[in-house]
A protein has these predicted regions:
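Bacterial Sec-dependent N-terminal signal peptides
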Residues: 1-26
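Short, contiguous alpha-helical
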Residues: 22-25, 31-32, 44-48, 55, ...
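Membrane-helix exit/interface motif
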Residues: 58, 62-65, 91-100, 128-136
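A short, structured active-site edge motif that brings together acidic residues
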Residues: 106
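Acidic/histidine-rich alpha-helical segments that form the ligand environment
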Residues: 109-167
């Protein structure tokens, strides 16, 4: 019986991966900035910058890039991408005012994780952009019934900054593995040059 499902399952995984790669994802370019400087608009722009960097840091990764790590004690690019996925969940759950919980992602392909990460960042950015009181968003953990809460400041120096840091690691690692970041990407302007 198992043999009957093996080939369709492999094809389904391949089709899902192909569809995810052809899907129009956010952050090919940074969205237009807000007209007014507010705390919410600034946080939104930080997340948009993260989304743009993540999009291009992970665009065009090869199998050999995903398994690359510069030393035995370092994370592979795939492990780093997975960590950014978890950080994006923290940002997203905070935007939704939910306790931090993680999506089980062991069965997801890299392209699925990438797609979901970008969509979570975009949704979070949209929520924060239109917020007048950023202080209402707390980082909330519920571990085995024990609740702990942190102010939004920790979101800035925690998950947002950490994810930016790790995007830089992916760019560095992929350069070392022989597949450099697209040189036409202009992170200052948030565009890709022709």
């Amino acid at each position: 019986m198992t043999k009957n499902f093996t080939v369709p399952l492999i094809i389904l995984c391949f089709v899902n991966d192909s569809l995810a790669q052809n899907e129009k994802l956010p952050y090919v370019e940074i969205p237009k900035h807000a007209e007014v400087y507010t705390a919410g608009a600034i946080v939104s722009r930080m997340i948009d910058g993260l989304g743009f960097r993540f999009y291009w840091a992970t665009e065009g990764l090869r199998i050999e890039d995903l398994t690359f790590k510069p030393s035995d004690k370092a994370r592979t690019i795939a492990e780093t991408l997975n960590h950014i996925f978890e950080l994006a969940q923290m940002i997203h759950n905070t935007a939704l005012k939910k306790d931090i919980s993680y999506i089980q992602n062991e069965e997801m392909s890299i392209s699925e994780k990438r797609s979901i990460t970008l969509k979570m960042l975009k949704k979070s950015s949209d929520i924060f952009r239109n917020t007048q009181n950023i202080g209402q968003f707390k980082i909330s953990f519920n571990r085995d019934g024990k609740q702990s809460e942190y102010p939004f400041w920790n979101q800035i120096n925690g998950p947002i900054s950490d994810a930016l840091w790790h995007c830089g690691q992916i760019v560095s690692h992929r350069r070392t593995s022989g597949n450099p970041f697209n040189s036409k990407v202009n992170v200052f302007r948030g565009i890709v040059s022709d």
